[in-house]
Amino acid sequence: MSTPVDHRAGPSSAPRSTVRADVAVIGGGVVGHGIAWEAQRSGRSVALIDDAPGSGASWAAAGMLAPVSELHYQEEDLLELMLDASSRWPGFAAGIAGATSGSGYLTTPTLAVGADAADRRALMDLRAVQQANGLAVEPLTVRDARKREPLLSPAIACALDTPADHQVDPRRLLAALRQALAGAVRGKPGLAVAGAVEGYAVPDRAGGLLWEGGRVVGASLAGGGTVLATDTIVANGLQAGDLGGLPDGLDLPLRPVHGDILRLAVPQHLQPLVTSTVRGLVHGVPVYIVPRQDGTVVIGATQREDALSDAVSAGGVYQLLRDAQALVPAVAELELLECTARARPGTPDNAPLLGRVPAAPGSAGYKAGHVPGLIIATGFFRHGVLLTPAAAAICAGLLDGHADPRWAPFSPERFSRPAAARTNHHTKETV
């Protein structure tokens, strides 16, 4: 017997339709699509809920797969996750490529470049930390760096080779994942979700989680329908913290970290502008230039916490072009095609919120140790594209009942009151 809908799960209007799937994934960015594809590959039917899939941070992202370059002090747990994800990328990309026209994954290396003596010291200090963690970063002479990348400025102060840091084109990746999800449904009709577009897509916004018998059983939709599922995975980035029906006391402290990013066309006489991803420091400010297979480059990215939302900052565009030109002067001759700004979902420790939610004493999931039917996968900050294969594998393991203890530091509960101090998660049913 059901009771009235909990107000936190959105408007209590009667559902216009009900979609049923083994797994509901809330959020259609790269992470959500990757999780959905991995769940589908395990033989589960998947409903991917998003009213504008691929339009958020994933659309703007440069797609650097850079666990070595992205190492920061006191982020060893995150480094282990990034290295795990990096090791999964070849197989992940090959699986997508086998089902589609290609994922946009490239194993081109990364070149770290410093513009002045202070930048050189900063990069060498970082190299010491990288080496202490067993990571390969080799100094190059400026002459050798310019042999590899002839359009680098002769005035740069240093260069370091980072062969393990690669790249993927997130826009191509998203298109390939959509193609793979739809193709799997066509190949195995049993995976099709009735009422979903192409057998998997639910083009609506999730209003809130639905509960029954103390477990999460799906999500309500802003348009009035519902998605019922054995497991629901919350992967909608910044919107996750505002989702209705989250377990009582669960705090998902997500903050928007905006970034401006540019896309430019390289004239024929300058192609290739660079063949490696160039990550630079220019007077202490980071900038990168990522080459694409179509002859364009991506230059990014600022990092700002302001009120501009998705508006592009004029100062950010100026800074990016100025600093990129300091490293590769020919940037001045490129055609500016696109300026984009999006917000990345950051957390207080810059690490993701990833895993099941511990259950409160007396709740339906207390014996199992977690809230039944719910997985959180958000807060990936700068690393969403890189971490996608790891997040997908971790969620697939959780669906099968396996929790890898290595990833306990990323528990989505770590900024909340401990489960033992919380009351029963839900006393009302919402379906």
Model-identified regions with their sequence ranges:
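C-terminal catalytic lobe of FAD-dependent flavoproteins
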Residues: 330-431
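Short hydrophobic core segments
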Residues: 24-26, 227-239, 392
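Short beta-strand to alpha-helix junction loop
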Residues: 80-83, 113-122, 160-179, 311-315
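Helical element adjacent to the flavin cofactor pocket in flavoenzyme catalytic cores
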Residues: 160-223
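Active-site substrate-recognition segment that forms the wall
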Residues: 34-41, 51, 63-64, 101-105, ...
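N-terminal Rossmann-like FAD-binding beta1-loop-alpha1 element of flavoenzymes
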Residues: 21-47
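Dinucleotide-binding Rossmann-like beta1-alpha1 core, especially the glycine-rich loop
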Residues: 64-148
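Extreme N-terminal leader/targeting segments of oxidoreductases
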Residues: 1-22, 41
